[in-house]
Amino acid sequence: MTISVARGVVMPRHLAIGGAHRHAAGMATIAIYSLKGGVGKTTLAVNLAWCSATRSARRTILWDLDPQAASSFLLHGTAGRDQAQAMFSRDISVAKRAQPTPVAKLDLITADASLRGLDQLFHTLDKKKRLGKLIGALTDYDRVLLDCPPGLTETADQVMRAADLIVVPVIPSPLSQRAYEEVIRHLGGKVPVLPVHAMVDRRRRLHADALAANPDWPVIPMSSVIEAMTVQRAAVGAFAPRSTAAAAFDQLWRTIEHRLAAGSAAD
């Protein structure tokens, strides 16, 4: 049996969740990643972390690995001066870097500008599973979500080795689809991927055609309430719980939890 992950790309069902990536009993790592920037990656990361903590009552931590620190801003994180990279090169407890957020059961590890040098640091350290080892120390959490910087970099490779599931936002456009297929080729079937149509306007012919080509992909709509996150500094479900966007994030999170549960059963 196989499950389709992209048109022309399939993944064996036994890879529905990468059991080999599990760090502790019950813990799962979910990376939100895209080769391209500007596709709604941080929006997904914050809303999925909120759903994990509130809808599933999971002990959740969002680790912001993007030097732009957008997730850190949205969740009211307090970043130290150029400290985010230090956890990777020094003997610093990653758990002690966790900060509470205004959301119960949701903690945050903030980003800062020092992460711009993270790729070079990984090359220097030559430790292929450094990120995975640090995640493994987060034993107080059920779900670890990673807001990843764009690009096929050493940081991306570290993420791919550590993740149980990679969520990839894809804008309904040929360029975004092409970037997604490049990610699939790079992974080579080693890590399960969940593509998500993001920033969707069903009135646009291009978007409608893309959705028709991949009808099984979850869909996150283009929405003014999502844009309002930067003003509210909160997940959509916190300030617009009855919105279409909030329902879409809830449904996406249920899909993710189902995948994780199916993977645990297969293990």
What is each residue range found by the language model?
Residues 26-67:
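Walker A/P-loop phosphate-binding motif and the immediately C-terminal alpha-helix
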Residues 55-139, 226-234:
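P-loop/Walker-type NTP enzyme "switch/lid" segment
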Residues 30, 56, 60-61, 139, ...:
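Conserved catalytic-core segment of NTP-binding enzymes
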Residues 47, 86, 130-133, 182, ...:
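Alpha-helical elements of Rossmann-like donor-binding domains used by nucleotide-donor carbohydrate transfer enzymes
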Residues 47, 51, 74, 158:
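Active-site signature of alpha/beta-hydrolase-fold catalytic machinery across serine-
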Residues 4-24, 189-267:
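C-terminal lobe/tail of nucleotide-utilizing enzymes
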Residues 36, 115, 174, 199-202, ...:
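Short histidine/acidic/glycine/proline-rich micro-motifs that form metal-
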